[in-house]
């Protein structure tokens, strides 16, 4: 039974890698379908807050489920517990905190919501089951330079992501409408500082977990967020004549 599930998890790694390619190509061709771009698309919609809560929920529920299961064989080891906690903490914030803080978010297309829900279900299962049942680490892995560097990147990335979201939420004063140029933090260097933070976060997780499961998640994040970030960057350049020309798309000073 365990061998069958391990084969399934291996297959899901390849599937997620394929989905990363599909996301990259698909978003290049048709662009993003949420937020400021949603009005360009027709179809049924889901209000922003419940959409965010429900689509992120599987990635919070899977690790919580593994934590309460007595049969979670590998969670007796400290590295496995810490890595699963890193994954869980992110999705607690995205599921329970982020939706509450949304200010006037535009409804999400039902199609986009369903795709996000399915991905969070797949990836939540993949990361949680691998770390709780199959990942083998030495007890002192938490002191290894790869883990420590990865953990530091994960933490810094999460802080950047949360701080950048805070800047975006507070661009408009009460009663104001329309769009503004983000200022402050890493927005002085890139157009999508929030995406950069999330990318750093999952690259750190991949390094700390030292696993293909972590790497393919970071790869999917890069493929999905880079195309969105480039669309944001182009939109800002077209919308604002005074938009800083020195800002990069996603990675400060590079890209």
UniProtKB/Swiss-Prot annotation:
<keyword id="KW-0256">Endoplasmic reticulum</keyword>
<keyword id="KW-0492">Microsome</keyword>
<dbReference type="GO" id="GO:0005783">
    <property type="term" value="C:endoplasmic reticulum"/>
</dbReference>
<dbReference type="GO" id="GO:0005789">
    <property type="term" value="C:endoplasmic reticulum membrane"/>
</dbReference>
<dbReference type="Pfam" id="PF02544">
    <property type="entry name" value="Steroid_dh"/>
</dbReference>
<feature type="transmembrane region" description="Helical">
    <location>
        <begin position="6"/>
        <end position="26"/>
    </location>
</feature>
<keyword id="KW-0521">NADP</keyword>
<dbReference type="InterPro" id="IPR016636">
    <property type="entry name" value="3-oxo-5-alpha-steroid_4-DH"/>
</dbReference>
<dbReference type="InterPro" id="IPR001104">
    <property type="entry name" value="3-oxo-5_a-steroid_4-DH_C"/>
</dbReference>
<keyword id="KW-0443">Lipid metabolism</keyword>
<comment type="similarity">
    <text>Belongs to the steroid 5-alpha reductase family.</text>
</comment>
<feature type="transmembrane region" description="Helical">
    <location>
        <begin position="107"/>
        <end position="127"/>
    </location>
</feature>
<keyword id="KW-0812">Transmembrane</keyword>
<keyword id="KW-0560">Oxidoreductase</keyword>
<feature type="transmembrane region" description="Helical">
    <location>
        <begin position="82"/>
        <end position="102"/>
    </location>
</feature>
<feature type="transmembrane region" description="Helical">
    <location>
        <begin position="205"/>
        <end position="225"/>
    </location>
</feature>
<keyword id="KW-0726">Sexual differentiation</keyword>
<feature type="transmembrane region" description="Helical">
    <location>
        <begin position="142"/>
        <end position="162"/>
    </location>
</feature>
<keyword id="KW-1133">Transmembrane helix</keyword>
<dbReference type="GO" id="GO:0007548">
    <property type="term" value="P:sex differentiation"/>
</dbReference>
<dbReference type="GO" id="GO:0047751">
    <property type="term" value="F:3-oxo-5-alpha-steroid 4-dehydrogenase (NADP+) activity"/>
</dbReference>
<dbReference type="InterPro" id="IPR039357">
    <property type="entry name" value="SRD5A/TECR"/>
</dbReference>
<dbReference type="GO" id="GO:0030154">
    <property type="term" value="P:cell differentiation"/>
</dbReference>
<dbReference type="GO" id="GO:0003865">
    <property type="term" value="F:3-oxo-5-alpha-steroid 4-dehydrogenase activity"/>
</dbReference>
<keyword id="KW-0221">Differentiation</keyword>
<keyword id="KW-0472">Membrane</keyword>
<protein>
    <recommendedName>
        <fullName>3-oxo-5-alpha-steroid 4-dehydrogenase 1</fullName>
        <ecNumber>1.3.1.22</ecNumber>
    </recommendedName>
</protein>
<comment type="function">
    <text>Converts testosterone into 5-alpha-dihydrotestosterone and progesterone or corticosterone into their corresponding 5-alpha-3-oxosteroids. It plays a central role in sexual differentiation and androgen physiology.</text>
</comment>
<dbReference type="GO" id="GO:0006702">
    <property type="term" value="P:androgen biosynthetic process"/>
</dbReference>
């Amino acid at each position: 039974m365990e061998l069958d599930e391990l084969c399934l998890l291996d297959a899901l790694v390849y599937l997620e890698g394929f989905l990363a390619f599909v996301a990259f190509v698909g978003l290049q061709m048709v662009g993003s379908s949420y937020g400021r771009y949603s009005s360009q698309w027709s179809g049924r919609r889901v209000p922003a807050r419940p959409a965010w809560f429900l689509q992120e929920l599987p990635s919070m529920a899977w690790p919580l489920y593994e934590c309460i299961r007595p049969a979670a064989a590998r969670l007796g080891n400290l590295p496995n517990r810490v890595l699963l906690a890193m994954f869980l903490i992110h999705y607690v914030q995205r599921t329970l905190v982020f939706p509450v803080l949304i200010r006037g978010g535009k409804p999400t297309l039902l199609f986009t919501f369903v795709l996000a829900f399915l991905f969070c279900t797949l990836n939540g299962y993949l990361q949680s089951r691998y770390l709780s049942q199959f990942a083998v680490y030495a007890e002192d892995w938490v002191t290894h330079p790869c883990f420590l560097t990865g953990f530091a990147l994960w933490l810094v990335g999460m802080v950047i992501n949360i701080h950048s979201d805070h800047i975006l939420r507070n661009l408009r004063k009460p009663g104001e409408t329309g769009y503004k140029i983000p200022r402050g933090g890493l927005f002085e260097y890139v157009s999508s500082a929030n995406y950069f933070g999330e990318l750093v976060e999952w690259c750190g997780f991949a390094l700390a977990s030292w696993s293909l499961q972590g790497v393919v998640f970071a790869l999917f994040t890069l493929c999905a967020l880079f195309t969105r970030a480039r669309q944001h960057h182009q939109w800002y350049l077209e919308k604002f004549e005074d938009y800083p020309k020195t800002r990069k798309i996603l990675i400060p000073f590079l890209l």
